[in-house]
Amino acid sequence: MSFTIPTNLYKPLATKPKHLSSSSFAPRSKIVCQQENDQQQPKKLELAKVGANAAAALALSSVLLSSWSVAPDAAMADIAGLTPCKESKQFAKREKQALKKLQASLKLYADDSAPALAIKATMEKTKKRFDNYGKYGLLCGSDGLPHLIVSGDQRHWGEFITPGILFLYIAGWIGWVGRSYLIAIRDEKKPTQKEIIIDVPLASSLLFRGFSWPVAAYRELLNGELVDNNF
């Protein structure tokens, strides 16, 4: 006996299509690429920030170096068109005119006379004053007169800010000593008499204590003693 097995009953196993394998791995590769891009993007931003900071630091250093390299007179002259007095022709002309007038007055007196000596001393003071204007960097306008800079520029504090603070300190010192003197004598039998005839020992002791008047005023302000409630 022989058996015949039909071949049409054999069905091979289904194989995966090629397009399925390619499609199944494609999204994974895309996700990996996206993750890599996400990881690289912060690094690029950090590098960009570092580069920007370095460029800003370089620009700032160049500005500072250029400002130090500029001559002081040129930097100081860059204020409202003013020029250093020692370079101003009008300033030099005013000095010559002032000395010329004094020289003309000097010819009217004998060399050893008191007026002549006084005029010579005035001439020396005039020369010294003009020299100091040029030496300390004051700025002059087109009229040849020195101009005080009150804008708060640190290069010109010695012209207005420092003298102004010193004036306020001295004025406050005088006022504080006078106030302390009036407070000290108000319990006397004749306080008005001591206002007319100053008690020198008392005033002298208060005079030296008045140097610390800003500290004393602040302390009395905190204690409520700065203002008298009776007035």
UniProtKB/Swiss-Prot annotation:
Its main location: plastid. It comes from Spinacia oleracea. The gene is PSAF. GO terms for molecular function: phosphoprotein binding. GO terms for cellular component: chloroplast thylakoid lumen; chloroplast thylakoid membrane; photosystem I reaction center. Pfam families: PSI_PsaF. The keyword Chaperone does not apply. It comes from the Eukaryota. Keywords: Chloroplast, Photosynthesis, Photosystem I, Plastid, Thylakoid, Transit peptide. One of its GO terms (biological process) is photosynthesis. It is found in: Plastid, Chloroplast thylakoid lumen. Residues 1-77 form a transit peptide. Belongs to the PsaF family. Signal peptide: none annotated. Coiled coil: none annotated. Probably participates in efficiency of electron transfer from plastocyanin to P700 (or cytochrome c553 in algae and cyanobacteria). This plastocyanin-docking protein contributes to the specific association of plastocyanin to PSI. This is Photosystem I reaction center subunit III, chloroplastic.
